[in-house]
């Protein structure tokens, strides 16, 4: 018989840096999940990623307190900030531009996020990411 799903927990955890402190500890602790077991498994799975990059993770907790988790790709905004070499987006995106990204960089981000995005094709994903870039105050070249 299949295990009964008790909860889904969605978190954003820095790649390779999961530890029992908030937000991981309290979210898993209240469900009775072994926090250190999750931290070790998550850090092992994300060791190939750039350390510190926020990674969305969906944890499925079962009635016997076991768990499974699925990692997603980092948010588009984080990847865009990294590509443009900026710390944060613009407070006034339509008037104050803070950086530029090229069409090639947007293509690269769209390909990286293709597994998580539900866009029909790569062009639709590129348009979505370009829109995110513009809303952050980035100039899209190309």
Swiss-Prot record:
A single Gene Ontology molecular function, please? Answer: large ribosomal subunit rRNA binding
- InterPro entries in the cross-refs: Ribosomal_uL11, Ribosomal_uL11_bac-typ, Ribosomal_uL11_C, Ribosomal_uL11_C_sf, Ribosomal_uL11_CS, Ribosomal_uL11_N, Ribosomal_uL11_N_sf
Processing and modification events after translation: One or more lysine residues are methylated.
Keywords annotated in UniProt: Methylation, Ribonucleoprotein, Ribosomal protein, RNA-binding, rRNA-binding
Q: Name one GO biological process term.
A: translation
Cystines in this chain: none
| Top-level taxon of origin | Bacteria
Q: Which Gene3D superfamilies match?
A: Ribosomal protein L11, C-terminal domain (1.10.10.250), Ribosomal protein L11/L12, N-terminal domain (3.30.1550.10)
CDD domains referenced in this protein's UniProt entry, alphabetically:
Ribosomal_L11
Q: Which GO terms describe its cellular component?
A: cytosolic large ribosomal subunit
The record ties this protein, via NCBIfam families, to: L11_bact (TIGR01632)
Report quaternary structure and partners.
Answer: Part of the ribosomal stalk of the 50S ribosomal subunit. Interacts with L10 and the large rRNA to form the base of the stalk. L10 forms an elongated spine to which L12 dimers bind in a sequential fashion forming a multimeric L10(L12)X complex.
The record's similarity note reads: Belongs to the universal ribosomal protein uL11 family.
> What function does this protein fulfil?
Forms part of the ribosomal stalk which helps the ribosome interact with GTP-bound translation factors.
Protein name (Swiss-Prot/TrEMBL): Large ribosomal subunit protein uL11
Q: Which gene encodes it?
A: rplK
